[in-house]
Protein backbone atom coordinates (compact mmCIF):
# COMPACT_ATOMS: atom_id res chain seq x y z
CA UNK A 1 0.00 0.00 0.00
CA UNK A 2 2.76 2.47 0.84
CA UNK A 3 4.57 1.75 -2.43
CA UNK A 4 1.47 2.35 -4.49
CA UNK A 5 0.73 5.55 -2.59
CA UNK A 6 4.25 6.81 -3.21
CA UNK A 7 3.97 5.96 -6.88
CA UNK A 8 0.70 7.81 -7.18
CA UNK A 9 2.16 10.77 -5.35
CA UNK A 10 5.15 10.89 -7.73
CA UNK A 11 2.83 10.81 -10.69
CA UNK A 12 0.92 13.74 -9.26
CA UNK A 13 4.12 15.80 -9.05
CA UNK A 14 5.41 17.56 -12.16
CA UNK A 15 8.79 16.89 -13.68
CA UNK A 16 10.29 20.04 -12.23
CA UNK A 17 8.97 19.34 -8.76
CA UNK A 18 10.35 15.79 -8.77
CA UNK A 19 13.78 17.05 -9.87
CA UNK A 20 13.76 19.73 -7.14
CA UNK A 21 12.80 17.22 -4.45
CA UNK A 22 15.51 14.81 -5.55
CA UNK A 23 18.09 17.60 -5.54
CA UNK A 24 17.11 18.68 -2.05
CA UNK A 25 17.32 15.11 -0.83
CA UNK A 26 20.88 14.91 -2.12
CA UNK A 27 21.71 18.25 -0.53
CA UNK A 28 22.64 19.96 -3.79
CA UNK A 29 22.01 23.56 -4.61
CA UNK A 30 20.91 24.98 -7.95
CA UNK A 31 24.38 26.46 -8.38
CA UNK A 32 26.00 23.05 -7.93
CA UNK A 33 23.64 21.41 -10.42
CA UNK A 34 24.27 24.18 -12.94
CA UNK A 35 28.04 23.76 -12.60
CA UNK A 36 27.87 19.96 -13.02
CA UNK A 37 25.56 20.15 -16.03
CA UNK A 38 27.40 23.20 -17.49
CA UNK A 39 24.14 25.15 -17.54
CA UNK A 40 23.05 28.53 -16.38
CA UNK A 41 21.42 28.82 -12.96
CA UNK A 42 18.43 30.45 -14.66
CA UNK A 43 18.02 27.39 -16.91
CA UNK A 44 18.03 25.04 -13.87
CA UNK A 45 15.48 27.29 -12.17
CA UNK A 46 13.22 27.28 -15.27
CA UNK A 47 13.35 23.47 -15.42
CA UNK A 48 12.35 23.12 -11.75
CA UNK A 49 9.51 25.61 -12.24
CA UNK A 50 8.30 23.70 -15.34
CA UNK A 51 8.96 26.66 -17.63
CA UNK A 52 10.04 26.29 -21.22
CA UNK A 53 12.27 29.20 -22.29
CA UNK A 54 11.13 30.73 -25.55
CA UNK A 55 14.67 31.01 -26.89
CA UNK A 56 15.43 27.35 -26.13
CA UNK A 57 14.46 24.58 -28.53
CA UNK A 58 12.43 21.68 -27.14
CA UNK A 59 15.10 19.17 -28.16
CA UNK A 60 17.71 20.91 -26.02
CA UNK A 61 15.25 21.24 -23.13
CA UNK A 62 14.58 17.48 -23.19
CA UNK A 63 18.31 16.79 -23.12
CA UNK A 64 18.83 19.09 -20.13
CA UNK A 65 15.99 17.40 -18.18
CA UNK A 66 17.40 13.92 -18.86
CA UNK A 67 20.85 14.99 -17.70
CA UNK A 68 19.32 16.55 -14.59
CA UNK A 69 17.41 13.27 -13.90
CA UNK A 70 20.54 11.14 -14.20
CA UNK A 71 22.33 13.52 -11.83
CA UNK A 72 19.70 13.13 -9.08
CA UNK A 73 19.19 9.37 -9.77
CA UNK A 74 15.66 9.50 -11.24
CA UNK A 75 14.83 6.94 -13.97
CA UNK A 76 14.16 8.59 -17.33
CA UNK A 77 11.16 6.34 -17.98
CA UNK A 78 9.33 7.97 -15.06
CA UNK A 79 9.86 11.43 -16.54
CA UNK A 80 8.77 10.63 -20.10
CA UNK A 81 5.04 11.34 -19.55
CA UNK A 82 5.89 14.66 -17.97
CA UNK A 83 8.32 15.58 -20.75
CA UNK A 84 5.59 15.31 -23.36
CA UNK A 85 3.62 17.93 -21.47
CA UNK A 86 6.46 20.20 -20.40
CA UNK A 87 8.56 20.14 -23.59
CA UNK A 88 6.40 18.99 -26.48
CA UNK A 89 8.12 18.62 -29.83
CA UNK A 90 7.36 21.58 -32.09
CA UNK A 91 7.62 21.42 -35.84
CA UNK A 92 10.37 23.67 -37.04
CA UNK A 93 9.30 26.43 -39.37
CA UNK A 94 11.39 26.28 -42.48
CA UNK A 95 11.28 29.29 -44.79
CA UNK A 96 10.78 28.36 -48.43
CA UNK A 97 14.01 28.53 -50.40
CA UNK A 98 14.19 30.58 -53.55
CA UNK A 99 15.13 28.38 -56.44
CA UNK A 100 17.55 30.61 -58.36
CA UNK A 101 21.17 30.43 -59.27
CA UNK A 102 23.51 33.28 -58.49
CA UNK A 103 25.77 32.21 -61.31
CA UNK A 104 22.98 32.49 -63.86
CA UNK A 105 22.06 35.97 -62.69
CA UNK A 106 25.68 37.09 -62.83
CA UNK A 107 26.14 35.56 -66.26
CA UNK A 108 23.01 37.26 -67.54
CA UNK A 109 24.15 40.60 -66.14
CA UNK A 110 27.59 40.20 -67.73
CA UNK A 111 25.92 39.42 -71.05
CA UNK A 112 23.88 42.63 -70.95
CA UNK A 113 26.97 44.62 -70.01
CA UNK A 114 28.98 43.14 -72.88
CA UNK A 115 26.17 43.85 -75.35
CA UNK A 116 25.95 47.47 -74.20
CA UNK A 117 29.74 47.85 -74.47
CA UNK A 118 29.78 46.55 -78.04
CA UNK A 119 26.86 48.81 -78.94
CA UNK A 120 28.67 51.90 -77.62
CA UNK A 121 31.84 50.85 -79.46
CA UNK A 122 29.99 50.46 -82.77
CA UNK A 123 28.32 53.86 -82.31
CA UNK A 124 31.68 55.55 -81.63
CA UNK A 125 33.29 53.89 -84.66
CA UNK A 126 30.34 54.87 -86.86
CA UNK A 127 30.41 58.49 -85.72
CA UNK A 128 34.17 58.68 -86.24
CA UNK A 129 33.87 57.27 -89.75
CA UNK A 130 31.04 59.66 -90.63
CA UNK A 131 33.01 62.63 -89.29
CA UNK A 132 36.11 61.62 -91.30
CA UNK A 133 34.09 61.16 -94.50
CA UNK A 134 32.34 64.52 -94.14
CA UNK A 135 35.63 66.30 -93.40
CA UNK A 136 37.32 64.68 -96.40
CA UNK A 137 34.36 65.49 -98.64
CA UNK A 138 34.35 69.11 -97.46
CA UNK A 139 38.08 69.42 -98.20
CA UNK A 140 37.63 67.98 -101.69
CA UNK A 141 34.75 70.36 -102.37
CA UNK A 142 36.79 73.30 -101.10
CA UNK A 143 39.75 72.39 -103.31
CA UNK A 144 37.44 71.99 -106.31
CA UNK A 145 35.79 75.34 -105.61
CA UNK A 146 39.12 77.14 -105.28
CA UNK A 147 40.41 75.52 -108.49
CA UNK A 148 37.27 76.53 -110.39
CA UNK A 149 37.53 80.06 -109.04
CA UNK A 150 41.17 80.26 -110.10
CA UNK A 151 40.33 78.95 -113.59
CA UNK A 152 37.54 81.51 -113.92
CA UNK A 153 39.88 84.34 -112.91
CA UNK A 154 42.53 83.21 -115.39
CA UNK A 155 40.01 82.97 -118.23
CA UNK A 156 38.61 86.40 -117.34
CA UNK A 157 42.08 87.93 -117.37
CA UNK A 158 42.88 86.32 -120.73
CA UNK A 159 39.66 87.71 -122.25
CA UNK A 160 40.36 91.22 -120.97
CA UNK A 161 44.01 91.27 -122.13
CA UNK A 162 44.59 93.12 -125.46
CA UNK A 163 47.74 93.66 -127.51
CA UNK A 164 48.78 97.32 -127.75
CA UNK A 165 49.99 98.24 -131.31
CA UNK A 166 53.30 100.04 -131.62
CA UNK A 167 53.41 103.57 -133.06
CA UNK A 168 55.04 103.10 -136.47
CA UNK A 169 54.20 106.52 -137.85
CA UNK A 170 56.81 107.85 -140.30
CA UNK A 171 56.11 111.48 -139.51
CA UNK A 172 58.65 111.55 -136.69
CA UNK A 173 61.68 113.57 -137.58
CA UNK A 174 64.86 111.73 -136.63
CA UNK A 175 66.62 115.02 -136.20
CA UNK A 176 64.25 116.03 -133.43
CA UNK A 177 64.66 112.76 -131.56
CA UNK A 178 66.96 113.22 -128.65
CA UNK A 179 68.31 110.88 -126.04
CA UNK A 180 67.78 111.41 -122.34
CA UNK A 181 70.78 112.78 -120.52
CA UNK A 182 73.20 110.07 -119.53
CA UNK A 183 74.25 109.64 -115.92
CA UNK A 184 77.68 111.23 -116.07
CA UNK A 185 79.58 112.79 -113.16
CA UNK A 186 81.94 115.50 -114.53
CA UNK A 187 84.06 118.25 -113.04
CA UNK A 188 84.80 120.11 -116.27
CA UNK A 189 82.81 123.11 -117.27
CA UNK A 190 81.89 121.93 -120.76
CA UNK A 191 81.61 118.30 -121.81
CA UNK A 192 80.69 117.47 -125.35
CA UNK A 193 80.66 114.19 -127.15
CA UNK A 194 83.18 114.21 -129.99
CA UNK A 195 81.81 113.76 -133.44
CA UNK A 196 82.16 110.35 -134.99
CA UNK A 197 84.55 110.51 -137.93
CA UNK A 198 83.91 107.03 -139.21
CA UNK A 199 80.84 106.58 -141.36
CA UNK A 200 78.00 105.36 -139.21
CA UNK A 201 75.43 102.89 -140.44
CA UNK A 202 72.16 104.27 -141.63
CA UNK A 203 69.51 104.50 -138.99
CA UNK A 204 65.89 103.86 -139.80
CA UNK A 205 63.95 107.10 -139.22
CA UNK A 206 61.12 105.07 -137.70
CA UNK A 207 63.31 103.88 -134.85
CA UNK A 208 63.35 105.89 -131.66
CA UNK A 209 66.36 106.10 -129.35
CA UNK A 210 65.46 104.22 -126.15
CA UNK A 211 67.40 104.71 -122.95
CA UNK A 212 67.26 102.15 -120.11
CA UNK A 213 65.34 103.43 -117.09
CA UNK A 214 68.13 102.12 -114.86
CA UNK A 215 70.40 105.01 -115.80
CA UNK A 216 70.96 107.41 -112.92
CA UNK A 217 70.43 111.16 -112.98
CA UNK A 218 73.12 113.49 -114.21
CA UNK A 219 74.95 115.23 -111.35
CA UNK A 220 77.26 117.92 -112.77
CA UNK A 221 79.31 120.62 -111.13
CA UNK A 222 79.28 123.00 -114.14
CA UNK A 223 77.31 123.80 -117.25
CA UNK A 224 75.31 120.73 -118.39
CA UNK A 225 76.53 118.96 -121.51
CA UNK A 226 74.50 118.95 -124.70
CA UNK A 227 71.91 116.26 -124.77
CA UNK A 228 72.67 114.98 -128.22
CA UNK A 229 75.24 115.50 -130.99
CA UNK A 230 74.17 115.12 -134.58
CA UNK A 231 76.52 113.20 -136.85
CA UNK A 232 76.99 114.11 -140.45
CA UNK A 233 74.80 111.16 -141.41
CA UNK A 234 72.06 112.27 -139.00
CA UNK A 235 72.36 109.20 -136.71
CA UNK A 236 71.92 109.64 -132.99
CA UNK A 237 75.13 108.88 -131.09
CA UNK A 238 75.24 106.19 -128.45
CA UNK A 239 75.91 107.26 -124.86
CA UNK A 240 79.58 107.04 -124.06
CA UNK A 241 79.20 106.20 -120.37
CA UNK A 242 76.45 104.83 -118.10
CA UNK A 243 77.80 105.43 -114.63
CA UNK A 244 75.77 104.72 -111.50
CA UNK A 245 74.00 101.59 -112.83
CA UNK A 246 73.11 99.50 -109.72
CA UNK A 247 72.65 95.73 -109.57
CA UNK A 248 69.17 94.69 -108.30
CA UNK A 249 69.26 93.24 -104.77
CA UNK A 250 67.27 90.08 -103.94
CA UNK A 251 64.20 90.68 -101.80
CA UNK A 252 64.75 89.16 -98.31
CA UNK A 253 61.00 88.48 -98.06
CA UNK A 254 60.90 86.42 -101.25
CA UNK A 255 58.79 83.25 -101.11
CA UNK A 256 60.30 80.22 -102.86
CA UNK A 257 58.24 77.07 -103.46
CA UNK A 258 59.23 73.76 -105.06
CA UNK A 259 56.55 71.22 -106.01
CA UNK A 260 56.97 67.44 -105.87
CA UNK A 261 53.44 66.73 -107.15
CA UNK A 262 50.46 68.55 -108.63
CA UNK A 263 49.12 71.05 -106.10
CA UNK A 264 46.58 73.88 -106.04
CA UNK A 265 47.92 77.07 -104.45
CA UNK A 266 46.81 80.60 -103.62
CA UNK A 267 49.17 83.29 -102.26
CA UNK A 268 48.05 86.76 -101.12
CA UNK A 269 50.26 89.51 -99.70
CA UNK A 270 49.50 92.12 -97.03
CA UNK A 271 47.83 94.48 -99.52
CA UNK A 272 45.32 91.84 -100.54
CA UNK A 273 46.95 91.30 -103.93
CA UNK A 274 46.89 87.74 -105.21
CA UNK A 275 50.46 86.91 -106.13
CA UNK A 276 49.43 83.49 -107.44
CA UNK A 277 46.23 81.45 -107.66
CA UNK A 278 46.05 78.24 -109.62
CA UNK A 279 47.45 74.76 -110.15
CA UNK A 280 51.17 74.01 -110.08
CA UNK A 281 52.46 70.88 -111.76
CA UNK A 282 54.99 68.37 -110.52
CA UNK A 283 58.68 69.45 -110.49
CA UNK A 284 57.62 73.07 -110.85
CA UNK A 285 58.94 75.98 -108.79
CA UNK A 286 57.59 79.38 -107.89
CA UNK A 287 59.36 82.54 -106.68
CA UNK A 288 57.01 85.25 -105.40
CA UNK A 289 57.76 88.70 -104.02
CA UNK A 290 55.32 91.00 -102.30
CA UNK A 291 54.58 92.80 -99.08
CA UNK A 292 54.70 90.57 -95.99
CA UNK A 293 52.89 88.94 -94.32
CA UNK A 294 51.80 86.36 -96.89
CA UNK A 295 48.59 84.35 -96.63
CA UNK A 296 48.78 80.90 -98.19
CA UNK A 297 46.16 78.28 -99.07
CA UNK A 298 47.64 74.95 -100.12
CA UNK A 299 45.46 72.11 -101.34
CA UNK A 300 48.10 69.37 -100.92
CA UNK A 301 50.66 70.40 -98.26
CA UNK A 302 52.69 67.22 -98.80
CA UNK A 303 53.37 68.18 -102.42
CA UNK A 304 55.14 71.51 -101.78
CA UNK A 305 58.32 72.66 -100.03
CA UNK A 306 58.35 76.31 -98.96
CA UNK A 307 61.31 78.52 -98.10
CA UNK A 308 60.77 81.94 -96.58
CA UNK A 309 63.66 84.27 -95.68
CA UNK A 310 65.99 81.42 -96.62
CA UNK A 311 64.50 79.02 -94.07
CA UNK A 312 62.13 76.08 -94.66
CA UNK A 313 58.53 76.39 -93.47
CA UNK A 314 57.18 73.48 -91.38
CA UNK A 315 53.96 72.00 -92.84
CA UNK A 316 54.05 68.72 -90.91
CA UNK A 317 50.93 69.46 -88.84
CA UNK A 318 48.88 69.84 -92.02
CA UNK A 319 50.43 66.75 -93.63
CA UNK A 320 49.61 64.56 -90.60
CA UNK A 321 45.94 65.58 -90.60
CA UNK A 322 45.68 65.59 -94.43
CA UNK A 323 43.97 68.99 -94.41
CA UNK A 324 44.04 72.03 -96.65
CA UNK A 325 46.84 74.22 -95.27
CA UNK A 326 45.89 77.79 -94.34
CA UNK A 327 48.78 79.72 -92.86
CA UNK A 328 50.25 83.19 -92.62
CA UNK A 329 53.96 83.94 -92.96
CA UNK A 330 54.90 87.17 -91.22
CA UNK A 331 58.18 89.04 -91.15
CA UNK A 332 59.48 86.92 -88.25
CA UNK A 333 58.75 83.68 -90.18
CA UNK A 334 56.24 82.38 -87.65
CA UNK A 335 53.54 80.54 -89.62
CA UNK A 336 50.14 80.95 -88.05
CA UNK A 337 46.95 79.02 -88.73
From Swiss-Prot:
Which cysteine pairs are covalently linked by disulfides here?
Answer: none
Domain HTH cro/C1-type span(s) in chain numbering = 19-71
Gene Ontology MF term list? DNA binding
Gene Ontology CC annotation, any one = plasma membrane
Write out the coiled-coil annotation as residue ranges: none
Q: What is known of its domains?
A: The helix-turn-helix (HTH) motif in the cytoplasmic domain of the N-terminus is involved in the formation of spirals to maintain the rigid rod shape. As this protein is anchored in the cytoplasmic membrane, the HTH motif may contribute to protein-protein interactions to form the RodZ helix, which is localized beneath the cytoplasmic membrane. The C-terminal domain may be critical for determination of the rod shape by probably interacting with enzymes required for synthesis of the peptidoglycan layer, including PBPs in the periplasm.
Query: What protein am I looking at?
Result: Cytoskeleton protein RodZ
Q: Which organism is it from?
A: Escherichia coli (strain K12)
